[in-house]
Amino acid sequence: MTPRTRHGGRRPGAGRPGSGRRVGVPHRARPFHDKGHPEHVTWRFVPGIPSLRRRALAGAIGRAIRGITHSHARRRTSFRVIHFSIQPNHMHLIVEAGSKRTLARGLNGLGTWLARRVNERIGRSGKVLADRYHARPLTTPRAVRNAIVYVLQNHRHHEPSRHLVDENSSGPWFRGWAEPLAPPPTEAPVAEPVTWLARTGWKRHGPIAFGEAPSG
């Protein structure tokens, strides 16, 4: 009797070979997104790009965020960048979105804007973002406040700003500081928060002092 040839199923060595490329963030299905919970997003850039905190690059990134903010406001989508900061080789954002799909599409669109602006600025082409972003839902007022401190004051861990508030962030436009701060004359690059947690809830734990540093 001729043995039957087996097709499909799990077999040792079967499937597409691995790329051998080390990935910073594991590729896995993203969890459920609750529209009432802002997300803290960390996004790394590829090695070889100059410090993102240089004036020219930080300006290009700020314009990309302002552009995506205007684009989504014009189209009345539920994706919003509400806080951000630029570090030497990565950036932090706090975003809102009405659905898991809107979150993914909004961040992918932002990634395209960032790549275009950064490549134009430094005269290169190709990949700019190193890997998938890492997104963490913020589910309590305390978690949102901690994330705002972490994002806006993160420069203290990397390249401390010479200014009272980090100019390479949305901090100059932030209205939750404990001390008065006149905003810049230019339009804010970020959107106003809509979720209760990001708009009001976090304030239960008090305003943020200029000298407050992120924990951890």
Each model region followed by its residue ranges:
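Short Pro-Cys-Gly-centered "Cys-loop" motif that presents a nucleophilic cysteine in a tight turn
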Residues: 1-39, 43-89, 96-216
